[in-house]
Design a protein with these regions (language model features):
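Bacterial signal peptide processing site
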Residues: 21-24
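Signal peptide-proximal N-terminal region
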Residues: 36-42, 66-91, 208-211
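Extracytoplasmic "Venus flytrap"
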Residues: 37-69, 94-100, 123, 189-197
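Beta-alpha junction/loop-to-helix N-cap segments that form part of ligand/metal-binding clefts
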Residues: 60-63, 80-153, 162, 220-227, ...
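Alpha-helical structural signal in soluble globular domains
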Residues: 67, 71, 78, 129-137, ...
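Extracellular/periplasmic Venus flytrap/periplasmic-binding protein
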Residues: 105, 148-150, 157-262
């Protein structure tokens, strides 16, 4: 039997910053002279980024935070003027540690601090509960990587997603597996998070529609480091491929343990 391949999909960080702030005011009849604008002190505008900068996926959270910092530096370098006033965007960075309770506490804190927008949160499990709070206080929420469809099913007009959702991602991975030569049977492992479960459910449905046989569906947690018991059980089913619904911080160790098992 050939070794099964590991099909993974982890959160990829991408940041798009759309800057806008201030109350709506009538447009002036003529642009203010540059000297007049420059003479006034720039208004400091808080722009937030929230995600896990500690814990197992801190590397992703830090990448997103650095992306926001770079974007705001570029915007500030242009000496932006909004409503005739010079403004400077000030980053407000918050660490939710990938924890839903911390995410909701941060969301309320950002509402109280009058942040004009937030890039975050990174995971579906943190983005969904936080979105309700951002909606209530009117802060635009831009998530770079939360994929669970429930995030946007609420219909909140202030919530934006910069990545395809699980329905699209799970289907794409399943269709890829079905077209891959030699893949007839698959096993699934998911981390029981909103992301992992959602991706795995769609993958299973579409995989079976495309003629693949799902021979096992195992569960782990997003904190696990030892996958040997799960992989040993899966090995007896002899799948051609394994779908892991989780993040790269666990996919790497899982792949190494697969190789150890042969």
């Amino acid at each position: 039997m050939h070794k099964p391949s590991l099909l993974t999909f982890g959160a990829a960080a991408a940041v798009l910053v759309l800057a806008g702030c201030g109350q709506k005011t009538p447009a002036p009849a003529a642009s203010a002279p540059a000297s007049a604008v420059a003479a006034g002190e720039a208004v400091s505008v808080p722009f937030a980024v929230a995600g896990p900068t500690s814990g197992g996926i801190a590397h992703i959270g830090k990448d997103v935070e650095n992306g926001v910092r770079m974007a705001l530096d570029e915007i500030n370098a242009t000496k932006p003027v909004i409503g005739g006033k010079a403004v400077t965007f000030k980053i407000v960075a918050e660490d939710d540690a990938g924890d839903p309770k911390q995410a909701t506490a941060i969301a309320q804190k950002l509402c109280d601090s009058k942040a004009v927008a937030v890039v975050g949160h990174l995971q579906s499990g943190t983005s969904i509960p936080a979105s309700r709070i951002y909606h209530d206080c009117g802060i635009p929420q831009i998530t770079p990587s939360a994929t669970n469809p429930d995030l946007t099913k609420s219909g909140y007009k202030n919530v934006f997603r910069l990545i395809a959702n699980d329905n699209q991602l799970g289907a794409a991975v399943a269709e890829f597996a079905a077209k891959k030569e030699g893949v007839k049977t698959v096993a699934i492992v998911d981390d029981r998070t909103a992301f992992g479960q959602g991706l795995a459910a769609v993958f299973k449905q579409v995989a079976e529609k495309n003629g693949l046989q799902v021979v096992a569906h195992e569960f782990t947690s997003d904190k696990a480091v030892d996958f040997m018991p799960i992989l040993t059980s899966i090995k007896t089913k002899k799948p051609d491929a394994i779908l892991f619904g989780g993040l790269d911080s666990q996919a790497g160790p899982m792949l190494r343990q697969m190789q150890q098992l042969g």
